[in-house]
Each structure stands twice: as structure tokens, then as C-alpha cells.
Amino acid sequence: MKIIMTGSTGFLGSALVESLQKDGHQVVRLVREGGASGTDAVFWNPLSGIPDTSALEGADAVFHLAGENIVDGRWTAERKHRIMNSRVIGTRTLAAALSELESRPEVMVCASAVGIYGVNPDGAVTEDSPSGEDWLAQVCVEWESAAALAEDADIRTVFMRMGIVLHPSGGMLKRVLLPFRLGLGGRLGRGTQPMSWITLRDAVSAFRFVSETDSLSGPVNLCAPENSTNIDFTVALGKSLGRPTVLPVPPLAIKLIFGTELASSILGGVFMDVGKLLDSGFTFQDPNLAQASPMLGQE
């Protein structure tokens, strides 16, 4: 298969590229000027366009993962602007380019996030649940809506509403490993807030699965089937490392580091129902923390 990918140098993107290439698929990477290069790279500007779309012709699938890191610092007005534009305008730019191809891809799989549901500690949300009212939920709603041109061009479009992707090599887990290894890790706030997570290998498998499953379209919740709280994760990681986890991080400290708005998202969350993905035949390798924990503390 010929596959187009944005965000190919990111945490999830690089793992997905490796998996696809290992199985013999051709991956064409859309990269920014000054970014990664190579014979498989096509330059684009997410905010303005793709100068040469000929390399996209004849693709079977598109994986769209590009976007400004949401939790990498306080949500200042400038960062909010970059986060929103990188997702909304970037998605609209890509969808427009795909819609104008003579030979269009069958499917476009877009990253989205659990943040679309806002904060709701009661019950598990499904893909039909209403979106939240906070700023992050608004970003996710506009992010998904920006792919309308692809849908209008009869490209099957899937939005992967992901929880936190876990692997020691990157993402949130890499950031917290050192304090946990030093015995300084602990729950965030009360620790009772929902924490929707998925291991990196399951995320890669799920993206590939939905691209190959014609019956799946629209939003798809993506996290481990087991409902977990922050304290559940904290205990599992401490056990994996053989270290105590008795030093909680107070809410005030999180607010001082990240600002009130981002802190509210960190200290909140939702449980997600993944019945749509399970009913379509997907099998998780790490459906719960007990099975994922050996990986959590790997070097």
C-alpha cells in the first residue's frame, strides 16, 4: 500500500512509520521545510498548502497526526493560537489537497483526542456523547470539522479520539519516569480523576486496523478497555519500577506549573467506552494496567 503521513517524526508517528515500512508499505511523509528529509519526504506548509501534490496521487490511505503539542507548556494566548491553527488549518489544508486529487485515497485517519468530551468523571462516554464546553474540547471539535472536504469527496474519514499514549520512549510516560525512579512519584491531586490511556503498540495497531476496516468511519474512541484512574496508573508504575509512590502532587503545584486552564484538564478527564472499536473486531494487546505494567518501567 502507498500511505501518506503527517506527523511522521512524532512519538506515535515514528512508531507507525516503522510498523508500516516493516510490512513493506510505501510511506510518503509530509514534512515542513527544514524538517526531516529523505527520498520519501514531500514538503508542505500546514498553514498554506502543499506545493506539489503529484506525490500524493494514487495513495491508498492517509494518516494525519501533525499538530502542536497540547501539554508542552502553559496555554498562553500565543500557544492557544498555534495549537488551534496547527490542527484546524493543517487538517483543512490536507483535506482540500486530497479532495482535488485525480486518484484519491480510500481512507483518511486523523488523530483527535479524549479532550473533545471535556471533564466528566461520571460514567463512560461513547462516540455519540456530547462534546465538552472548555477550550480543549472546542479545539477538538473544530479539528474534526476541518476534515469536511475529505468527507465530501467520499474519502472515508476516521477520527481517533485518543487517550494518553504510553511507552517509556516518549510522551507523558518518559517525562515522569525519572521522578518515579527516584521514589518521588505520586498521584496528581486526589488521583481519583479518570485516566484514559493506551499503550503505543496498541495505538499503532488500532490506527492500522481502522485504515483497513471499511465499516469504521467518523469518531472512534481509542483507549484501553479497562477504566483506570490516575492513582491506578501511579500504583502500577510504582510497582513496575519497584519504587514507592507516596508523594502526591498537590493541585496548587500543577496550577502554578501549567496555569489554571491546562491544570483543569490534567486534573479532570473522562472514562471512554471503546465498544465501537471492539465490536469491529479489534483486539488489544494491553487491555488493562496489569498487562501493560511490565512495559511501563522498561529502560
Regions found by a protein language model. Give the residues of each.
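Conserved Rossmann-fold NAD(P)-dependent oxidoreductase catalytic core, especially the SDR/UDP-sugar
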Residues: 92-134
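C-terminal amphipathic/interface module of NAD(P)-dependent oxidoreductases
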Residues: 264-299
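Mid/C-terminal beta-alpha module of Rossmann-like enzyme folds, strongest
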Residues: 213-260, 294-299
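Glycine/proline-rich active-site loop of Rossmann-fold NAD(P)-dependent oxidoreductases
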Residues: 153-155, 166-175, 209-220
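Conserved beta-loop-beta element that borders a ligand/cofactor-binding pocket
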Residues: 112, 145-168
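NAD(P)H-binding glycine-rich loop region in Rossmannoid oxidoreductase-like domains
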Residues: 35-90
